[in-house]
Structures are given as structure tokens and as C-alpha cells.
Amino acid sequence: HLMTTDDFAIWQAKASDAHQGWISAQNFHAKPGKSIYFAAPDGRIDFAIGIFGNHAVWDGAALAASLPKGHWQFTAASDDLDAGLLESLALGWGLGQYQFHTYRSAAAPAVNYLTLPDGIHADRLIGQMGGIYLCRDLINQPPNHMTPAALQTAMETLAKTHDATLETHSGSILETEFPAIHIVGRAAEIAPRLMDLRWGKKGPKITLIGKGITFDSGGLDLKPSKAMEMIIN
């Protein structure tokens, strides 16, 4: 059950003696991102209460981390929990399950599953999480693996998956058309490149310009030593 701190205060005032005793024994204080669960007579979890506030994405992630591993479903304690808020909580829940296990030899830890509530745009939600997961995977790669060439391979895979187009510019064209990229990266062991990824033909045109920093910092010690150490770290 999803509640605000005010919802919880109202519910607690009407709760059974057993539930109130359990809340007291757990020293539970209703704060956004916190949760408490209650057991059925047979010892299994009967239900849980999760508290959310003004930062639904963060609260959703915190709830996913705090609850016992299993399959969960959101129910609202009041009509104030609209579809948009539910979607933000679900997004946070999904982002809280992220794991980077590319180099892991042992089995990945268990995760918490969520059955999406009615009214949520599942495709949009999964798309958002997929994009953030991809960025996290790229960032978490060790620097000797995530080179400009490796980033190009990742973008080629992304373009193929989503029927997008990718143009990659490298070599002499950078010297004449994109001199800043050429000057900074020309001494690097793995050559710099400019990637132009395009997707979709309908709707307004939106351009996002991203400066993809990989480990190659140009190959030239243009910064003070301490700053270069920070780049490496």
C-alpha cells in the first residue's frame, strides 16, 4: 500500500492493536522511501506499506531496496495517487534494480519484481529505463574497455536495435570540419570520432548534443597533474 506520511498517520490511528504493536516494535517512523511489512498468521508477508513524498522516483527506488525480495504490486491508499505519480514510482523502482554484472563471475543478486498498475504506459516506462540502463552500463565500463571505438560499437548496436541511422566521422574530415575534436584527440592511441545518431521522422525535431567522454583524454597533458589524475579516476 502506497501512502503519504499523512495517510499513514490516519491508517495507524485505526490499525489493530497487533499492527500498532508491530509498528512500535520495529521502531518504524513514516518517512518518504521507508517501508514496513506485516506478517500473516502463517508467517508469510501479508502486506507492506511504502511511504512516498515529493520525490517519487527516488522514493520508488528506496522502496525497492528496502522491501524483502519478491513480487510486489502497488495499491493506493488515497485517490491522490494519479497515473503520473505511479509511473514515477515505478520508474524509480526499476532504476533501483539496476546491476552491472558484465564482469561478474557469481550469480547476480535477486531483484524485486513489480506488477505495473493499470493506467501506466508500460512501453514508455521500459524505454526510459532501457535508456538509463544503457548509459549506466557505458559509464561503468572500465576505461581501458570503453574507448572511442567501443563507444562507436555501442552506438551502432543502438541504431540497429531501434531502426535509427548512425553516421561516424573520423580521420582527415575532423581536421577540416571539426578541428576542436581533431586537436584534442589527435595524439590519442585510439582515434577520436564524431557520431551522429538520428531516429524518427514524425513530430518536432529535437537535437541533443552530447560530449561523450571516454578514457582517451587527448593523449596530451594539457591539464595540471592533479586534474589528469582526476580524469583517470
Regions found by a protein language model. Give the residues of each.
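Cofactor-binding active-site loop characterized by glycine-rich and histidine/acidic residues
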Residues: 217
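N-terminal hydrophobic/helix-forming segments and targeting peptides
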Residues: 1-214, 222-230
